[in-house]
Amino acid sequence: MAEFGELEAQDGVRMPWNIIPVATKKEQSIDSEVPVSAIYTPLKPLRSQSLLLPYSPLRCRTCRSVLNPYSVVDFSACNWGCPFCFNRNPFPLNYSSVADNNLPPELFPHSTTVEYLCDSFSSPSPPVFLFVVDTCLISEELDFLKSSLFQALDLLPDTSILGLITFDSLVRVYELGFPHCTKSYFFHGNKDCTKDQLLDQLSFFVKNPKPSSGVIAGARDGLSSDDIARFLLPASDCHFTLHSVLEELGNSPWPVAADHRPARCTGVALRIAASLLGACFPGSAARIMAFIGGPSTQGPGAIVSRELSDPIRSHKDIDKDSAMYYHKAVEFYEMLAKQLVHQGHVLDVFASSVDQVGIAELKVAVEQTGGFVVLAESFGHSVFRDSLKRVCQSGENDLGLSSCGIFEINCSKDIKVQGIIGPCASLEKKGPLCSDTAIGQGHTSAWKMCGLDNNTSICLVFEIAKIDTADVVLQSQSNQFYFQFLTYYQHSNGQTRLRVTTLSRRWVMGTESLQELSNGFDQEAAAVVMARLISSKMETQPEFNPQRWVDKALINLCTWFGDYQKGNPSSFSLSSQLSIFPQFVFHLRRSQFVQVFNNSPDETAYFRMILYRENVSNSVVMIQPSLISFSFHSPPEPILLDVASIAADRILLLDSYFTLVIFHGSTIAQWRKAGYHNQPEHQAFGHLLQSPRDYADTIMSERFPTPRLVICDQYGSQARFLLAKLNPCDGDAHFSGQSNVFTDDVSLSVFLDHLRRLIVH
């Protein structure tokens, strides 16, 4: 799979089918199980800064695609042919010197991904951060949160615009521009507040009269900059005031009965935050950063009543349609999502609670705006603390936050777009590229991406038109399909840029070219696409059976590409390009994306939101965790994700993306407890203990959200974090130091045996 990694490094794209199958109208499409699709990372860092071009792109007059290496150039006539619509376009005067030995950079063969600087003369706008803080917390948790906020504020640039809102049963909007004392405006948490009501109550039109018509949006459209600066102002101007307000901030003063939950109006607070940003900074790089410590119990967006006797909804309640608050809350957050997308703003949620806070309902607003979600047990936990630090820091290890993105696609006429599964919102740009079948955000060829970073990855799903007969192949002018992805965005330095990626993939008749299709099959990308499709279908199709769907897809794919003798299971084999795919499917069936019964709706929503925005390599770790062995007998090495890998004299490091587990075998644990690693004559043992911790620290420093670290011993209570991910052994195996795992799940070998029998019979 190294060659697919090279393609990803160049263009940020991984496709399950790198040679695309085409079928006649009388045949079953091979891609009906794993669709023709692409996992694309729009802002993957370029290999060379020379591919940043300081001018505007040259576009086709007919289809608006951008000049690219696959364009056919006629130097004598000084024009170029578009590979998408075949229209010929003249070069403008500034391209008059184009020649075979004097090509512009966008025509170089390796320039399949280039970036254009769209407004080199405009002044960059500063980022805006509006903090929305839940005060219905115990004092210890609030102190943890305040400590992290102080650290975050110190990391933000002085030019960034800051604001503060707090909430319990009331919402407080702080006037940070008032220098004499702490001043805030109160809003009741029981009812929604429109933008006009908000502006009236915040006295925005005392000095300047309210416009009689038109949209009130920012200093240019009805609001004075002085009024805006009362609530949202540069960090350098409000640093002292904001620190003072946070230092004085106490937990909610309202008494809470022992059998009740606190009155928490999360929905109203977020609505007020969105309206304030929409009025003051529309279309700017603004983020609402919400810090939530429990479930919303009051006003729009509430997910449960205040009585503790009323349990928070479970998966079973949602499936049976007996979750009383769920649908109303989702409807409210869908409305909030539309408002934020229209304004171009991002919602980030940092949830820290042992209880559910409503991530399942908030999911639509966070996902459609491209926001982050972090789920931790406490505001003092490193998962929250380090993740917040990564969002706010700038420099070598930052996330590369960008904003105000618009993603568009062009492709060959026989390809239609079914949709995108990922952090974006449809712009409802209908046209000939749109398929009748919608997957995820469908029925459009353009999407809004309010927030995106260097790792944000979207899954595009395509539909390939069937041909009448195989004779059409012989008459075809070209056996290439072309795709062009265009991403407009505001860079973290304030520049507006356009990233253009143009791809070419060969197509073949599926049933006649199985070997060629097999050679171009990327099984890692296929597993990730399957995981996204399953998760999306489980969210939108109540009767969907994920195990049956994925099993059918695997059986059909292996039937197409497997080599076997009829009736002889032992003869079955797959080529190296597909040999690991059944193993991926086995682990996908057992993963948190399919098996939701052991997780809350909030946890399931959290896992899926992270899956929807991560690249292939990170997503594969979520599906099939990696296991590394550390011992005296060999250097660190990856080993099978199997119970047989446990040994008394071995340390294991499990990486399941969300959790890192350092597991000490029983002998290693005894030596550690005896303190041998502190003795000079046992330095080698000390190095052995430290080695997995160094590996884990490296992973934690590069990953977002920061994973949870669990350090445990064999036979200890927390060893369950490792054992739950391991493949159970068959029967009564006798491995040295092996733990017994009692489970209803079949082992990988039994799963593969059943697969072989089904295929050959």
UniProtKB/Swiss-Prot annotation:
SUPFAM superfamilies named in the record: beta-sandwich domain of Sec23/24, C-terminal, gelsolin-like domain of Sec23/24, Helical domain of Sec23/24, vWA-like, Zn-finger domain of Sec23/24
Quaternary context: Component of the coat protein complex II (COPII), composed of at least five proteins: the Sec23/24 complex, the Sec13/31 complex and Sar1.
UniProt entry tagged with the keyword Lyase: no
Organism, scientific name: Arabidopsis thaliana
Residues reported in the UniProt entry to bind Zn(2+): 60, 63, 82, 85
Similarity field: Belongs to the SEC23/SEC24 family. SEC24 subfamily.
Function description: Component of the coat protein complex II (COPII) which promotes the formation of transport vesicles from the endoplasmic reticulum (ER). The coat has two main functions, the physical deformation of the endoplasmic reticulum membrane into vesicles and the selection of cargo molecules.
An annotated Gene Ontology molecular function: zinc ion binding
Membrane topology annotation: Peripheral membrane protein
Annotated localization: Cytoplasmic vesicle, COPII-coated vesicle membrane; Endoplasmic reticulum membrane; Membrane
Record's protein name: Protein transport protein SEC23 C
Entry keyword Signal: no
Main location per the UniProt record: membrane
InterPro entries hit by this protein: ADF-H/Gelsolin-like_dom_sf, Gelsolin-like_dom, Gelsolin-like_dom_sf, Sec23, Sec23/24_helical_dom, Sec23/24_helical_dom_sf, Sec23/24_trunk_dom, Sec23_24_beta_S
Keywords tagged on the record: Cytoplasmic vesicle, Endoplasmic reticulum, ER-Golgi transport, Membrane, Metal-binding, Protein transport, Transport, Zinc
Entry GO CC: COPII vesicle coat; endoplasmic reticulum membrane
Lineage: Eukaryota, Viridiplantae, Streptophyta, Embryophyta, Tracheophyta
Region (Zinc finger-like) location: 60-85
Pfam family, one: Gelsolin
One GO process term, biological-process aspect: COPII-coated vesicle budding
